[in-house]
Each structure stands twice: as C-alpha cells, then as structure tokens.
Amino acid sequence: MKLLAPVLWAMAALGVTWLVAVDSKESCTKHSNGCSTPLRLPCQEYFRPACDIHDNCYHCGTIFGISRKECDDAFLKDMNTLCKKLGSNSATCPARGKREVTSHRATSIAHSRLWKTALDQKSFLNRKARQAILLTPNSCLYWANNFYMAVHVFGARSYSRTTDPKDCQGLKHCLPNH
C-alpha cells in the first residue's frame, strides 16, 4: 500500500502536466482557421502549425506590438523551417492520401527535365540549378512562397487593429518570436 500512494501521485502529476500541455496547444488554435483557402492546396495541412501562429499573430499582433509585416515575414520563415525539416525530401510536401501519392509520382516524372537541366550545369551546386529544383510547382518552398504572397497581398482585411486585449490573454506563446 505504501508503494501505491507515490505511484498514484506521480500519475496524477503527469496527468495534470499533460492536460496543461494539451490546453496550451488548444489555446493556440483559438483564433486560428488553419490554412484557410477556398481550394485544397498542396502543403496546406503540413503548414498548419505556421498558419495557426500566423492567424494568432493577425488577431493579437497589435496587442503585443507586432506589425502585419512582421506577422507575414514570420509566417514565411516558419513555413521555410517546416520545409527544411523535410531534409532531402524538401522538393515535395508530405502526401496525405493515395491519390496525392499517385499524382506526386506522375508529377515527378513530368518534372524530370528540371533534374536533367540541373545536372547539365557545370556544377550541381550552381545556385540557379538549385533554385530551379527547389521551386518546382510541387516543392514545399514553392508553396511556402505562394501562401506568403497570398497573405501579403490579400490579408490586410484580416489583420485586426481592434482586438479586445482580454481575447489575447495567455496567448503570447502562440505568437511568432520577433
């Protein structure tokens, strides 16, 4: 019986820690609509963590002194970081279903000319050759730039200048580090 009490206390402490972590994560989606677009786009789900931070930044940025430009720049940086996490697979976003996997294979074959062009360069490390490969229409970096341009051009109406400070209490950890 004496051994049971410490185990129960430890389980309770771990449970509370887990609940706080879940609550903290959930609070970061309070003002987020994900990567909302009228169409389903590649990388949309993969970029969701960056979109959540960006949505919170648009909602609470003025409260914490973060400009719209800083929100957008942090958004691009966060998406590029996600792309870099893919490592050597950064040429494409992770596929979500069989249809996307199949279309990805077909697209890879269709874009094989880009690889040939890059390999024909004097050096594979040639900057233009690398850019041609990384910014193909299915690349993670290509879509990161597209998402960034969309919010940069069309996001002005969504950036809130009249947010109630109470709405943003406890959300500073959900904003970009600027």
Swiss-Prot record:
Catalytic activity, EC: 3.1.1.4
GO cellular component: extracellular region
InterPro entries xrefs: PLA2_conodipine-like, PLipase_A2_dom_sf
Coiled coil: none
Keywords, comma-separated and alphabetical: Calcium, Disulfide bond, Hydrolase, Hydroxylation, Pyrrolidone carboxylic acid, Secreted, Signal, Toxin
Signal sequence, renumbered to the chain: 1-24
Propeptide segments, given as residue ranges: 98-130
Location of this chain's protein in the cell: Secreted
Primary site of residence: secreted
Chain positions found as Pyrrolidone carboxylic acid: Q131
Cofactor dependency: Ca(2+)
Enzyme class: hydrolase
Complexes and interactors: Heterodimer of an alpha and a beta chain; probably disulfide-linked.
Similarity comment text for this entry: Belongs to the phospholipase A2 family. Group IX subfamily.
Family matches, as PANTHER family: AGAP006772-PA
Function: Catalyzes the calcium-dependent hydrolysis of the 2-acyl groups in 3-sn-phosphoglycerides.
Protein name stated in the entry: Conodipine-P1
Species assigned in the record: Conus purpurascens
